[in-house]
């Protein structure tokens, strides 16, 4: 270091640098205006401290005097401390996290990962194979009847609007149109496409709420849940309704930062989702809350008005729909979402089933909600959507993770586990973003604990594989039974079949197998020759004595008490004979179907 004029050498000062800083502040000096500055010497090395140059090596102009002159100005007058700021390249710790930093390459990697997730989900659904279930058969043949009624004015055999879990002219007609083109496989393909769209929208929504990594984690977890796999393989309204609900959520998140009211586009989509399947009504408040919470980091408190506007407009639309369509739809919606099944002792089985269907995802969602509330980022300087205040983060976690528990509460209120498998998919869709946060926190920054994420996802995959296979094997292959029944069809004949929906669906188009010719063992309203209407066991017994049915089929599984009474009556009546016994075998179902025919 060069010596100052009239004073001792200036000691070397090391740069002030923080490990996480983007700049380095270097000590500097101001030269005497009368002295021409010399080129700066190379800075000393950290391992080799600066050495003072000897006086002989210095130019005469800068060689220190033996005694400072009193006439000379002091060092403080000619030399003042100052700093220079040098911007350094971003380091590993000071710059953005490499995984979360936007780049074209990572965009394509994320798209490829999403395609793989959707491919796995499709394979998991397509591997399930069985004949139509009772619910699928009901939706599809009712859709054919509704389409014929709309297009040709054909009479309907019943008032489907009074008990269907959705508006009968929506999904049933769509499913029937696909069935007309490619049969049951095409109708199921509609559901699969809807569920793949749902997973894709979940990724897009979560990516905007958090970031790319969290979106992929959420999609990977949701795609292997039992509800998503089953809904994608059943020709029912659940998948289409959930896809519409996902679209509504994506709209409110995508338009969160927009000043103009584009979020209102979510209202008709959400209402259509609820009309397709009344179960979606339970999740409309979540859509409204999500609209406000997603916009809060951008618009602050005025964003909460969005939630109120969405809720108010949706209520008005449904009120107008009820006034136009009639109270039958209200009755059906109440039955689907709020009517309690008689009986007790169902709480523990429902809790156990719910734990199997979604316990892992809900646990991850709770973990994600807590960790997100405590700390917005997984790693320092992680690229993430505006997290907002801690209150906002807590509210978002409670709304998303808590919606999964709403499904459980609704099933406990209904006192039944019927349709729990597909209903769980609705709640898990909303919990999946927070579950993605939880999985990302378990994995850690820079995939530090990737093995934990692999173990968790593998556990979810194994649960999805085992439970969906078990569910899809809970009803038997009906091919043999339908073939046996088709041998005894006759013009104007009546058929008593335990599950008549399946027979009606597979025999559609047969002139002697119209829906009005079938009766199930669930209910009968038989009018005697004297004009008296009998229901229940008395009605079935009176119909058998009168020879009302040509074919009677039962398997003692759904209505065992009634089937036992039917068997006793048929065995004592010489007009009926046992035409066959068809075994019904499935993975978790064993029964024998008895076919009685009146000669």
Region roles according to the model:
Residues 231-232, 238-241, 282, 414-447:
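Hydrophobic/aromatic-rich transmembrane helices and adjacent perimembrane loops
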Residues 114, 312-315, 383-393, 437-466:
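Signature aromatic-anchored transmembrane alpha helix within multi-pass, membrane-resident enzymes
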Residues 133, 191, 227-240:
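Short acidic/glycine- and proline-prone juxtamembrane loop motifs at membrane-interface regions
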Residues 209, 213, 248-263, 273, ...:
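Membrane-interface transmembrane helices that cradle and orient dolichyl/undecaprenyl
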Residues 121-123, 138-166, 170-173:
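Extracytosolic helix-loop segments that constitute the early lumenal/periplasmic catalytic or substrate-binding loops
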Residues 471-479, 485-529, 541, 545-562, ...:
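Short periplasmic/luminal acceptor-recognition loop of GT-C membrane glycosyltransferases, typified by
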Residues 142-145, 284-379, 397, 403-418, ...:
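Transmembrane-lumen/periplasm boundary regions of multi-pass, lipid-linked membrane glycan transferases
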Residues 1-41, 45-50, 55-56, 60-124, ...:
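Start-transfer (signal-anchor) and selected internal transmembrane alpha helices
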């Amino acid at each position: 270091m060069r010596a100052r004029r009239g004073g001792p050498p200036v000691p070397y000062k090391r740069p002030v640098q923080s490990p996480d800083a983007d700049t380095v502040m270097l000590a500097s000096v101001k030269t005497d205006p009368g002295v021409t500055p010399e080129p700066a010497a190379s800075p000393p090395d950290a391992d080799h401290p600066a050495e003072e140059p000897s006086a002989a090596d210095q130019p005469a102009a800068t060689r220190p005097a033996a005694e400072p002159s009193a006439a000379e100005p002091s060092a403080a007058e000619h030399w003042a401390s100052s700093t220079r700021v040098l911007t350094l390249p971003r380091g590993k710790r000071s710059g953005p996290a490499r995984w979360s930093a936007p780049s074209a390459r990572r965009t394509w990697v994320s798209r490829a990962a999403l395609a793989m997730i959707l491919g796995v989900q499709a394979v998991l659904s397509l591997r399930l194979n069985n004949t139509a279930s009772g619910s699928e058969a009901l939706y599809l043949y009712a859709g054919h009847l509704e389409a014929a009624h709309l297009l040709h004015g054909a009479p309907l055999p019943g008032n489907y609007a009074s008990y269907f879990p959705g508006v009968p002219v929506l999904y049933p007609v769509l499913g029937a149109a696909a069935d007309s083109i490619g049969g049951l496989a095409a109708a199921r393909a509609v559901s699969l496409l809807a569920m793949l769209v749902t997973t894709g929208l979940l990724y897009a929504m979560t990516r905007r709420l958090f970031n790319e990594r969290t979106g992929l984690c959420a999609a990977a977890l949701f795609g292997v849940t039992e509800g998503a796999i089953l809904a994608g393989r059943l020709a029912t309204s659940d998948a289409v309704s959930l896809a519409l609900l996902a679209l509504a959520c994506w709209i409110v998140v995508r338009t969160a930062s927009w000043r103009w009211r584009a979020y209102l586009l979510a209202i008709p989509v959400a209402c259509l989702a609820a009309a397709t399947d009344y179960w979606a009504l339970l999740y409309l408040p979540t859509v409204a809350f999500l609209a406000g919470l997603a916009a809060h980091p951008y618009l602050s408190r005025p964003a909460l008005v969005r939630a109120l506007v969405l809720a108010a407009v949706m209520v008005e639309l449904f009120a107008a729909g009820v006034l136009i369509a009639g109270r039958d739809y209200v009755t059906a919606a109440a039955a689907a979402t709020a009517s309690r099944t008689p009986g007790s002792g169902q709480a523990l089985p429902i809790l156990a089933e719910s734990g199997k269907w979604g316990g892992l995802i809900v646990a991850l969602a709770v973990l994600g909600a807590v960790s997100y509330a405590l700390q917005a980022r997984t790693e320092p300087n992680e690229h993430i959507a505006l997290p907002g205040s801690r209150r906002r983060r807590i509210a978002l976690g409670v709304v998303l993770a808590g919606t999964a528990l709403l499904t459980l509460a609704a099933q406990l209120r209904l006192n039944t586990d019927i349709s729990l498998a597909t209903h769980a998919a609705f709640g898990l869709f909303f919990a999946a973003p927070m579950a993605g946060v939880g999985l990302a926190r378990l994995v850690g920054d820079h995939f530090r604990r990737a093995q934990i994420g692999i173990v968790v996802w593998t556990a979810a995959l194994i649960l999805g594989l085992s439970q969906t296979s078990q569910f899809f094997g809970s009803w038997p292959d009906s091919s043999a039974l339908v073939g046996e029944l088709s041998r005894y069809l006759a013009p104007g004949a009546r058929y008593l079949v335990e599950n008549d929906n399946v027979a009606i669906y597979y025999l559609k188009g047969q002139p002697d197998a119209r829906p009005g010719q079938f009766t199930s063992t669930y209910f009968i309203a038989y009018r005697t020759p004297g004009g008296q209407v009998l229901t229940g066991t008395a009605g079935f017994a009176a119909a058998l004595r009168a020879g009302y049915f040509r074919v009677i089929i039962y398997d003692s599984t759904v209505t065992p008490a009634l089937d036992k009474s039917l068997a006793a009556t048929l065995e004592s009546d010489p007009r009926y004979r046992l035409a066959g016994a068809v075994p019904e075998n499935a993975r978790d179902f064993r029964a024998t179907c008895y076919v009685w025919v009146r000669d």
